[in-house]
Amino acid sequence: MMDILMYLFETYIQSDVELLVDQDELSDELSRAGFHQDDIYKALNWLEKLAALQETETIPYMNNSAITSIRVYIPQEMARMDVTCRGFLTYLEQIHVLSADTREMVIDRVMELETSDFVLDDLKWIILMVLFNAPGNENAYTQMEELLYGAEDGYIH
């Protein structure tokens, strides 16, 4: 599913291609590109849920978090995101690329992925997708894009 999400992000979203593409047409194109129908459906559903996160004004689990609060990960989140991924999220919060809200959106989207081999590079792409879709995060998106395409290890020194 990550391959499809990255393909869609690079092909349609990042390249400013007209986004008024029919879902059936898009599904057919992805099938012709070699992706399996089940994975296509899951990826498109994942993107719809990402869009829904942007449309809701209040998401209950994101309310009332103080700036000084520390995120405690549940066992399922720790199983999906290793210590490197969790450390990277903390790092991005410290340099103000992610806010508590965008961090929670990222974690929500990561947990919706059906993968057993989630790695830091996958996380970086998810973060980029969330920031691109979250209004008012243009500067954070630019910083994340520089991290993704710039530094090899992803950390600014």
From Swiss-Prot:
Cited InterPro entries: Smg
Record Pfam families: DUF494 (PF04361)
Protein family per UniProt: Belongs to the Smg family.
Protein name per Swiss-Prot or TrEMBL: Protein Smg homolog
